[in-house]
């Protein structure tokens, strides 16, 4: 997810997206541990998206 897209989301949407991405990330990690997935770069992309959203949430709490 792009940083500009994240900035345009509301706080509730950010929380919902964070929960959704964390669940997807854990599902893919488990699937990858059992048998390798086709695109392992998807794991890195999801992990970074989770970090971007968590950072935006923290940034908004400070303001």
Curated annotation (Swiss-Prot):
One of its GO terms (molecular function) is structural constituent of ribosome. InterPro entries: Ribosomal_uL29 (IPR001854), Ribosomal_uL29_CS (IPR018254), Ribosomal_uL29_sf (IPR036049). The keyword Endoplasmic reticulum does not apply. Pfam families: Ribosomal_L29. It comes from the Bacteria. GO terms for biological process: translation. One of its GO terms (cellular component) is ribonucleoprotein complex. SUPFAM superfamilies: Ribosomal protein L29 (L29p). Keywords: Ribonucleoprotein, Ribosomal protein. Disulfide bonds: none annotated. HAMAP family: Ribosomal_uL29. NCBIfam families: L29. Belongs to the universal ribosomal protein uL29 family. This is Large ribosomal subunit protein uL29. The lineage of its organism: Bacteria, Pseudomonadati, Bacteroidota, Flavobacteriia, Flavobacteriales. The gene is rpmC.
